[in-house]
UniProtKB/Swiss-Prot annotation:
Enzyme class: ligase
Family note: Belongs to the D-alanine--D-alanine ligase family.
One Pfam short name: Dala_Dala_lig_N
Role this protein plays: Cell wall formation.
Organism: Helicobacter pylori (strain Shi470)
Binding positions (Mg(2+) 1): 288, 300
NCBIfam families hit by this protein: D_ala_D_alaTIGR, PRK01966.1-3
GO BP terms: cell wall organization; peptidoglycan biosynthetic process; regulation of cell shape
Name recorded for this polypeptide: D-alanine--D-alanine ligase
Compartments reported by the entry: Cytoplasm
Length: 347
């Protein structure tokens, strides 16, 4: 089976998406037919596999390529010999953050009837906004930490709105990859932390920070009626897993497996199933959990995890191919114009 990897995007996580695509090239050797790059101006470019390395993008060489036009079932490439349709194999949406995870690309791909692996429109909207994610989890009976939602209008009253003691953690509501996230240990650190978070989002979440909390990551997808899970990862971290720890450490290809009981692993999987069904059908996602006093809490849902979390699976290729065979199908609406014909007939 062949794939097309779509990456880039107008997002704070643009470069992370490039790194993910390069990593996926290695994980799916020989299976990726096309690499389609989406730049910050929403132009699509076809990137040769030989150019899928950091130096190429650091030098912005893709700007010399002819842009492509998205159309039904593929991409349109103009040349001196006329327009040519590039028919796309199954697309993997690997655009992190804005464009890829907020629903824009899901809408575009669905509109043009281009099959893809990734979160659909509703799943994107709910998981991209951390506040909505908490409401969604609560409705499903999945626990989440207490929180306060701040915006520019009420930020001046932040200390009065926060109902828990220092330290607490501040994070943008609409950003991933630990961008804009900071731990506030005392009042004098608050303004700087708020300024940093508001650079990435119009709304921010504030949660109690619990020192030494156990954190577990679990990736997976649903293939037909059965779930396929990765192994459980316990990230090596200091206070929290920051941007550098997530993306600038290339010293290992595999994440550390968690040492946990069978009972706890089963709890994580049951919570994952609640969050996945049926909203995320067709996507491979990662759920990040906290365990506090033997209770499982959702930290966040990552609808397009970095490098598609391939490093957490023992057989990633087979998992992805099986998922590709069980994507949800949207029924095509047949337009018969029977109502209009009846009106015309009665005239």
């Amino acid at each position: 089976m062949e794939f097309c990897v779509l990456f880039g995007g107008a997002s704070f996580e643009h470069e992370i998406s490039i790194v993910s695509a390069i990593a996926l090239k290695e994980a799916l050797k020989g299976r990726i037919k096309y690499f389609i790059f989406l730049d910050e101006n929403h132009h699509f470019y076809l990137i040769e596999e030989s150019n899928m390395h950091s130096k190429y993008f650091a030098q912005i060489k893709e700007k010399k390529l002819p842009p492509l036009i998205l159309t039904c079932n593929g991409l349109l490439k103009n040349s001196f010999l006329g327009a040519k349709i590039i028919e796309l194999p199954l697309v993997i949406n690997l655009v992190h953050g804005g464009d890829g995870e907020d629903g824009k690309l899901a809408s575009l791909l669905e509109f043009y009837r281009i099959a893809f692996i990734g979160p659909g429109i509703e799943a994107s909207v709910l998981s991209y906004n951390k506040y909505l994610t908490k409401l969604y989890a609560k409705d499903l009976g999945v626990k989440a930490l207490d929180h306060v939602l701040l915006n520019e209008k009420n930020r001046a009253n932040a200390l009065n709105l926060i109902g828990f003691n220092f330290p607490f953690i501040i994070k943008p509501s609409n950003a991933g990859s630990s961008l804009g996230v900071s731990v506030v240990k005392e009042e004098k650190e608050l303004i700087y932390a708020l300024d940093g978070a508001f650079e990435y989002s119009k709304e921010i979440l504030i949660e109690p920070f619990i020192q030494g909390v156990k954190e577990y990551n679990l990736a997976g997808c649903k293939i037909k009626k059965d779930f396929c899970f990765s192994y459980v990862e316990e990230p090596n971290k200091q206070e929290f897993l920051d941007f550098k720890q997530k993306y600038l450490d290339f010293s290992r290809n595999k994440a550390p497996k968690a040492n946990l009981s069978n009972a706890l692993e089963e709890q994580l999987k049951e919570n994952f199933k609640k969050l996945y069904n049926d909203l995320f059908d067709g996507a491979l996602i990662r759920c990040d959990f906290f365990v506090i006093e033997n209770e499982v809490y959702l930290n966040e849902i990552n609808p397009i995890p970095g490098s598609l979390a391939n490093y957490l699976f023992d057989d990633f290729k087979t998992t992805l191919e099986n998922l590709a065979q069980s994507l949800p199908k949207t029924p095509k609406i047949q337009i018969k114009n029977s109502y209009l014909l009846q009106i015309q007939k009665n005239k």
